Amino acid sequence: TPTRPVLLPDAPALIAGVRGVVWLSADGEVDTLAGQEVARRLQSAQPPIICHGRSFFARLGVKPFAVFDVLELYAFVRPAEFTLPTPRGLAEVLGLALPTSHEQEAESLMAAAHALISELATMPRDRDSGAIAWAMQRGGWRWAEPVLAALGAGEQPHSGSAAAGLAVWDRLSEWNDRGPETPPRDLPVEPVEARAQLVKLLGSGAENRPGQADYAGAVAPAFDARNKRGEPNVVLADAGTGVGKTMGYIAPASVWAEKNEGAVWISTFTRNLQRQLDAELDRLYPDPVEKIDKVVIRKGRENYFCLLNFAEATGRLRSGAGAPGEAIGLGLMARWALKSRDGDMIGGDFPSWLADLVGRGTTLDLTDKRGECTYSACLHYSRCFIERTIRRARGARIVVANHALVMIQAAMGGEEGQLPTRYVFDEGHHIFGAADSAFSADLTGFEAEDLRRWLLGAEAGRHSRSRGLAVRMEDLIAGDDEAMAALDEALRAARVLPGPAWRQRVAGGEAVGPTEEFLSFVRQQVYARETGGAATYSLEAGTESPVPGLLEAAGALEAALIRLRKP
């Protein structure tokens, strides 16, 4: 029973269908309306309750307007918990009756809002939740009033106190450095052990699949100790659809990991398989607390929530440099960060639909996509999600990673000079393509822009931690005229790379410098010859018969890059 007020907006619930909009008034009346009638009614009504604003507005064919989006409320009340971003998906996770018509979907949205506010009203008092909600209220969050009432958050705090509610880094625990791990032993996995483990993992009610048991026994020799330097034991195993390959190799891998007190790294190509493995490993470690210690999903840094990026975003908000509405997205991110298992925003427990609702700037763009990590120099290093995951992996039994990360680590000798001794490569047919991707370089506008920023540092009006080569080198070469002259030459050469607003200039035919000139001609050729029609997310064209000027621009860019590369 709720212990605090459960307030709901006196607003209609709207569902946009193919044939019109279902309008469920707050007092229960249902109408199906055309677009013009909806617009007329909205002029005198409360902002409506809807689900997934972006798709709702797209279906109506209108510009966004003020709404109560139930998904935003769900992201606040149940951060890091999965739901499909639909009325039916919400009903399913909240234990409500599943809707089978648009009218029932509208009813379901109202019921979902009531259930979520009621859930808040029964939670133990939580200072963090109230502080975050107050910060979001200052940004104009529609749900703020019922949420604050349900939380019993009291009077509005000073603006500084409200902004401090977003300082999640102060509430995250610090990770502890583990001591050096004892090298794993080399006890073998007998085929009979692999088969027995498979039976245990599948349980007594599982379908009898002899091929799966044969597979588990056949791959067990891959875990034997090597007999010659540089000659690991390799089992190349293939099996048809339906055999159950995943559990077939998890069984011997888990036996080896426990017997030898070491980690087996399972390398995949796709995120879907990583998610599948994460779910399958619940069989091995049904206790969630034990699983956190024993299973780690490793990814590149660009996949994880960066606390420093988040702190800088909240700092811009406090200083007035950010738009007030950004507080809504940042507040929902704060809620998620406090509940997330590992801070993984790409395929982890981050709800991907949240970026559709509040924008990439306060969600996905908070990852470290630009390689600007300052590592131990960062104020939040001891609470960093990435560093925490790296340390957890050192003591784990099963580590799931992707081919690219595994190969890069192998090429660089591993973290602290230590490499895993046992690997399973699933989706092995992608290894060569993954290697090409991991060890190749892209000649793109974004890559060139990053290189310019690394060399010159942040330029006028740009939010970046890049200090530039001059700042990094000045203490080392102070007083050395020859070195200073070489530095000046390098910085002049770097200006051939695309600067701020290069995309607008390239698209507008106002390219500046050899890189932008080259990209402009490439863009011209792609747009002139692509055949994908409306498929604007994947434009491509052949390299044959280059458009006039492209080869000359390529030659000029090559000369400029050679000059930049010279010591």
Give the label of every model feature segment.
Residues 72-73, 102-185:
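N-terminal accessory nucleic-acid engagement/regulatory domains that precede
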Residues 220-224, 246-260, 281-284:
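Walker A/P-loop NTP-binding motif
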Residues 418-439:
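SF2 helicase catalytic motif II
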Residues 380-390, 401-419:
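Conserved RecA-like ASCE ATPase "motif II neighborhood" in helicase/translocase motors
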Residues 184-237:
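Conserved pre-motif I regulatory segment
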Residues 9-120:
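Conserved DEDDh/DEDDy metal-dependent 3′-5′ exonuclease domain
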Residues 184-198, 262-263, 268-397, 456, ...:
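A substrate-engagement module of RecA-like helicase motors
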Residues 237-249:
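Glycine-rich P-loop/Walker A and Walker A-like loops and their local beta1-loop-alpha1 context
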